[in-house]
């Protein structure tokens, strides 16, 4: 099995894994446990830029050069660096982790398990490859493959996956007790975390996390009494017996298909596409400035298409802004794929099957959601906005209508940055029905001063939409009354069945002084640990 006894337990003594953030998440926690503030990121401090994107917030952090890769940032390729030969001869072989259907004549279709020789890996997210099964050559998405016999090729290995996202995936409907995954440790370089779905009478379904440490000799262990040469051997050992874990490992967590950041290798750099390459199939929504459709690109790739009414915005300004939007890449932001920049403007993005969060809460599955799910959705939005905050960008129109929902209650932010470009007179005057007064911070509504802190105000309003299942903010008040009353210090009361601790967070978002409002980094940390802040992050095994 690869398990060896520790020769010097003192030399590899287990350290205390407990810290202030939590790992054991589930439906059994009571509402309203507040995290201890000192354990969270700076409440209202500003972030530092991490990519060369124009600074809309007057931050002074130095931008990192465009070639630098940051976690969750510009580059999304799983495998980086030069492909090396083994033993000086041959090439490293890669294996497909998923099925893929070619989208263009340049792509290569393949099936899970197929092996490849990589011809050229200089195109970033798309590699030129030769299939050893069919002999065919073409471009393949690099995040669909991994080196043969590597841990990246294992079904249970999820790489850079955060604790909260691991819990989200493991707690998805249909996963039995013992469903597991291994991911990179967020806190310890070179270490890993084992996350397991568990169940008991008190907590119901929940997730436990165990730290996998690395020996100086290269082996791995959870407890010093059971050490392994490889992660594969560790998994095999705990598949056969619990050996101090909450339960034995039963089945790897299902991996969803990875998101592609481009439609194809050609649209990676040339992403203005012909209108005739798009087919509008089903209208999903109709707004003041256009429509949203489910459609296809090239007849084979499902996408969402936002069509804008002529005159809504300048094509030149839109294209300039889209250049920036295309560089924003985060798993909680709807990915921009391509545009048709001649009027009527088309914006092509990834498709989210459950529609807008507003409709989902009012008329869809969201009506039955309980507070833990709602807080988790808020945490996802805060996570996407924390990325926008780090990139020194601004949304300007953050509300539930501009959040999209996918499978497993995944939430992604849409329409970031577009509000700045709208040329409608009634909208630009920040008056009348077209402008979202009830979501807008007073300094932005009255004086046009939009910053990331005005987005924080809007996020506080979005929180009320979540806990009230899509109720319009400030019920019974019109826009003029809202402006007047908010300027006089009025703030919405705590909604029915909303914990006072969550309402207090809303009130912090609505501070009159914008600089006193929390950062999105803080909001994300607070909400992710809302029910779990008093628990240890990692579980010790029984008698370990």
From Swiss-Prot:
Where are lipid groups covalently attached, annotated S-palmitoyl cysteine?
Answer: 3, 6
**Pfam families this protein is in?**
PK_Tyr_Ser-Thr (PF07714), SH2 (PF00017), SH3_1 (PF00018)
- List the GO molecular function terms: ATP binding; metal ion binding; non-membrane spanning protein tyrosine kinase activity; signaling receptor binding
Instruction: Name any Gene Ontology BP term.
Output: cell differentiation
Where does this protein chiefly localize? cytoplasm
Residues of the SH3 domain: 89-150
Per the record, lipidation of type N-myristoyl glycine is found at: 2
Keyword Kinase part of the UniProt annotation = yes
Phosphotyrosine, modified sites:
427, 538
* Keywords of the record: ATP-binding, Cytoplasm, Developmental protein, Kinase, Lipoprotein, Manganese, Metal-binding, Myristate, Nucleotide-binding, Palmitate, Phosphoprotein, Proto-oncogene, SH2 domain, SH3 domain, Transferase, Tyrosine-protein kinase
Catalytic activity from the UniProt record = L-tyrosyl-[protein] + ATP = O-phospho-L-tyrosyl-[protein] + ADP + H(+)
Report the GO terms under cellular component.
cytoplasm; plasma membrane
SMART domains given in the database record: SH2, SH3, TyrKc
The UniProt record lists the Protein kinase domain at: 278-531
- Which protein family is named in the record? Belongs to the protein kinase superfamily. Tyr protein kinase family. SRC subfamily.
Chain's role: Tyrosine-protein kinase implicated in the control of cell growth. Plays a role in the regulation of intracellular calcium levels. Required in brain development and mature brain function with important roles in the regulation of axon growth, axon guidance, and neurite extension. Role in CNTN1-mediated signaling.
The name of this protein is Tyrosine-protein kinase fynb
Organism, by scientific name, is: Danio rerio
């Amino acid at each position: 099995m690869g398990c060896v006894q520790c020769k010097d337990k003192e030399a590899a003594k287990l350290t205390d894994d407990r810290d202030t953030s939590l790992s054991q998440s589930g439906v059994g926690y009571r509402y309203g446990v507040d995290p201890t503030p000192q354990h969270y990121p700076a409440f209202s401090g500003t972030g530092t830029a991490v990519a060369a994107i124009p600074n809309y917030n007057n931050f002074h952090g130095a931008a990192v050069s465009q070639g630098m890769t940051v976690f969750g940032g510009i580059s999304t390729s799983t495998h980086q660096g030069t492909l090396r030969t083994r033993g000086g001869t041959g090439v490293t072989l890669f294996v497909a982790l998923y099925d893929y259907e070619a989208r263009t004549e340049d792509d290569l279709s393949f099936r899970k398990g197929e092996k490849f020789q990589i011809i050229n890996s200089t195109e970033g997210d798309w590699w030129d490859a030769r299939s050893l099964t069919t002999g065919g050559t073409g471009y393949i998405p690099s995040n669909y493959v991994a080196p043969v016999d590597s841990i990246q090729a294992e079904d249970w290995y999820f790489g850079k996956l955060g604790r909260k996202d691991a819990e989200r995936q493991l707690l998805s409907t249909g996963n039995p007790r013992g469903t597991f995954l291994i991911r990179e440790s967020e806190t310890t370089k070179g270490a890993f975390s084992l996350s397991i779905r568990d169940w008991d009478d008190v907590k119901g379904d929940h997730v436990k996390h165990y730290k996998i440490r690395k020996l100086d000799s290269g082996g791995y262990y959870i407890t010093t009494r059971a050490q392994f040469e490889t992660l594969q051997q560790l998994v095999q050992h705990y598949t056969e017996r619990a050996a101090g874990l909450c339960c034995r490992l039963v089945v790897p967590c299902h991996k969803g298909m990875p998101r592609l950041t481009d439609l194809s290798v050609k649209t990676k750099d040339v992403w203005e596409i012909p209108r005739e390459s798009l087919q509008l199939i089903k209208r999903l929504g109709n707004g003041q400035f256009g429509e949203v459709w489910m459609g296809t690109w090239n007849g084979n790739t499902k996408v969402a298409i936002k069509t804008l009414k002529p005159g809504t915005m300048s094509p030149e300004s839109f294209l300039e802004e889209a250049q920036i939007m295309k560089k924003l890449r985060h798993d909680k932001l709807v990915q921009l794929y391509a545009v048709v920049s001649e009027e009527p403007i088309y914006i092509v993005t990834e498709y989210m099957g459950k529609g807008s969060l507003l409709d989902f809460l009012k008329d869809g599955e969201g009506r039955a959601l309980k507070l833990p799910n709602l807080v988790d959705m808020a945490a996802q939005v805060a996570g996407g906005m924390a990325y926008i905050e780090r990139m020194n960008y601004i949304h300007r129109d953050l509300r539930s209508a501009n959040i999209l929902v996918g499978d497993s209650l995944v939430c992604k932010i849409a329409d970031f940055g577009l509000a700045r470009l709208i040329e409608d007179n009634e909208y630009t005057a920040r008056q009348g029905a077209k402008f979202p007064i009830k979501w807008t911070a007073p300094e932005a509504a009255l004086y046009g001063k939009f910053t990331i802190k005005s987005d924080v105000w809007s996020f506080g309003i979005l929180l009320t939409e979540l806990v009230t299942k899509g109720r319009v903010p400030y019920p019974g008040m019109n826009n003029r009354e809202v402006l007047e009353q908010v300027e006089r210090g009025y703030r919405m009361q705590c909604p029915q069945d909303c914990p006072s601790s969550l309402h207090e967070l809303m009130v912090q978002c609505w501070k009159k002084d914008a600089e006193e409002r929390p950062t999105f980094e803080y909001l994300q940390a607070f909400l992710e640990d809302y029910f779990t802040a008093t628990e240890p992050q990692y579980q010790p095994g029984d008698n370990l």
